[in-house]
Amino acid sequence: MDHERMRRLHGGKSGGLERVGFDVALKSKAPVATDTWEFRFERPAGFVYKAGRHVRMTMLNPAYRDRGGETRFFSFASAPHDEDLVFVMRMRDTAFKRSLMALNTGEVVRIEMLVNAPHGAFALDENAIEPAVFLVGGIGVVPAYSMIRDTLERSTPRKLVLFYASRTPEDAPFLVELQDLAARNANLVFVPTMTGGDLPSWAGESGRSDANLIKRHIGNFMPATYYIAGLPDMVSAMRSVLKAEKVPAANVLAEEFGGFTMAHGHGKKRGSLLTIGIVLAVAAVVVAHLAAGAFVLRLGSFELSNPAMIAVGGVAAVLLLAKLVFFLRSGHRT
């Protein structure tokens, strides 16, 4: 999930798009793939959402804390007709994920959802009739699973095609469930492919999703809405494939997934700290010059024989030289 983009959409306490929040209690948690867990929460009365949408989840009383904060964004793995709210995620060694794992049944988290999806949101148009083609990798299958189940539940004639790349079958959440759905629904074409090399136990497609794989199963790129979800590199590669096949950009929706990283936030913090440091350094220079000036006035006329004046002059020269070096290294251009 692109956490920075989600933060911009949600904004702060008083900014961003309109949203609604609920406190939801944990019902159960269970592993569903390698390093991947399902968290099932009670669905509040009157809670309505669309398949493929996301929520902002906040730990109210986290057992662990770090600089990443107590908030993350997750797509629904459940479909709107399900009794519970379900989220599936890769587990990483972060304070948020450890706090989530530490939750006991009945303990609550807060989830917030945008009231109206922004333009271009990663969600299925329920009124569309053209085919929907999903190109997903890894945990990017989560919103696709929600949207596919919702579409099949509504018994629409819309054709659905899912290309699902995973390293191994053991790493692939919902693999068995999707195989079962495809076996029972003629409108769903499911093409899983494994990228983990030689897998004797796997008899299906292998290798990354690409134009050749797609064409083998659906022929030429059909007029459709294409949904891409996965790691940033995978999303970029699929965009390039669709562009090369002349698929209109307006027919492509994408959502980047990946482990939460504090690098972006840390970069901002480093930038802020650097700015603060520069300001403090300039302030120190100004104060030093003022002090030197006051010292000169107090001593009277400048005399090279005066050791105090030599010291003051030396300090001033060093400060001026430091300012000049900083000026040149900062890349200043007139």
Model segments located where?
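Short, surface-exposed secondary-structure boundary micro-motifs
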Residues: L60, L114-P118
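A short, basic/flexible loop-to-alpha-helix module at the beginning of a structural domain
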Residues: A117-A128
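Conserved beta-strand elements of the Class I
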Residues: P131-L135, Y227
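Ferredoxin-reductase
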Residues: R5-V109, S166-T168, M194-G197
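Histidine-anchored nucleotide/phosphate-binding helix
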Residues: F76, V141-S155
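Short, conserved phosphate/pyrophosphate- and ester-handling motifs at nucleotide-, phospho-/glycolipid
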Residues: G52, G140, L231
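Conserved S-adenosyl-L-methionine
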Residues: I129, E153-L160
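Reductase modules of NAD(P)H-dependent flavoproteins
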Residues: H3, G11, L17-F22, K159, ...
